[in-house]
Regions:
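Short, well-formed alpha-helical segments that are part of the catalytic scaffolds
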Residues: 12-28
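Short aromatic/hydrophobic "clamp" motif used to bind/position activated sugar donors
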Residues: 84
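Acidic donor-binding loop at a coil-to-helix junction in glycosyltransferase catalytic cores
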Residues: 164-180
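A conserved acidic beta->alpha catalytic loop
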Residues: 12, 23, 38-49, 65, ...
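Active-site donor/metal-binding and catalytic loop motifs
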Residues: 163-167, 191-211, 223-226
């Protein structure tokens, strides 16, 4: 019986995928025969799996290049596990990541677990709360795809209008949408455990260029679209808009032109996402 299905896709990161495979092989206190690993290959990564633990049920799917959400939906059709996770191609696990996740899920109280992300230098990859707690609709505890371990629901898939590669430039929010749908419509209980770690590179020294601005803009469109899709209250939306507006003013006053411009693109993207309608 499969307990956990891991869904991963990549276009051109064979070294990072190999690192993930190594971290998966190094998991302790688990039965590898209960792990399913589904990889949607949009490039040429087959050699990364030559040393994968043979007890793991490996599913390899060759695909043309596509959006992240579409690739995950391809894999979701093959899931056999009770739970599903979505490790990024450049993330990697601590040796006890999966066993600690199991310790929460096996209690039978929670349908899912989300954890904390750290980079190579053991610095948080986002603003994660210091204390563990139950996930709530208005407090997802900085949950992001690679930190999620969730009960599999056969009728739920990713919104392909959202995420990296979106045809509508809605470049983020697909995992938050998936998680919120589980909370709102499937009545799932999900626990955030600050002691469970998944590693992921952090863009601390990302270049301050047009690419960074476009990324901020696309992500902001995703944030705005997510707010409307899940009927977030007006005060929540206003707070969401005021922050980048203040950022524009503050960074302009302090003569930080790139940061001011990035705040502008975030505000612009969030407004566009809030008003976006599918044709």
């Amino acid at each position: 019986m499969i307990k956990l299905s891991l869904i991963q896709t990549s276009q051109n990161r064979i070294n990072q995928v190999s690192r993930f495979v190594n971290s998966l092989n190094e998991q302790i206190n688990i039965n590898f025969e209960e792990i399913q690993y589904i990889f949607v290959d949009q490039g040429d990564h087959l050699s990364a799996f030559t040393k994968l633990n043979e007890k793991i049920k490996f599913e390899y799917i060759k695909s043309d290049k596509c959006s992240l959400s579409h690739a995950r939906n391809i894999a979701l059709k093959l899931v056999k596990g009770t739970y599903v996770a979505f490790p990024d191609d450049d993330c990697w696990y601590q040796a006890d990541t999966i066993s600690k996740v199991y310790s929460i899920l096996d209690c039978g109280i929670y349908d899912g677990v989300t954890c904390i992300g750290y980079n190579e230098k053991m610095m948080p990859t986002s603003t994660f709360p210091p204390a563990s707690s139950k996930i709530k609709r208005f407090n997802l505890c900085a949950a992001i795809s690679y930190t999620l371990f969730l009960r599999y629901e056969k009728t739920l898939s990713f919104d392909e209008n959202m995420g990296v590669g979106s045809p509508h430039n809605i470049g983020s929010g697909e995992e938050s949408d998936y998680l919120l749908t589980l909370l709102e419509y499937y009545n799932h209980n999900v626990f955030y455990d600050a002691s469970i770690i998944v590693h992921h590179p952090a863009e601390i020294d990302a270049p301050k260029d047009v690419v960074a601005l476009q990324k901020a803009y696309k992500y902001a469109r995703g944030d705005g679209y997510l707010m409307i899709k899940h009927n977030m209250p007006l005060h929540h939306i206003l707070k969401f808009l005021i922050r980048p507006f203040i950022g524009i003013l503050w960074f302009t006053i302090t003569i930080r032109p790139f940061e001011a411009k990035r705040s502008y693109y975030r505000l612009k993207g969030r407004i566009e996402g809030l008003t976006f309608k599918l044709k």
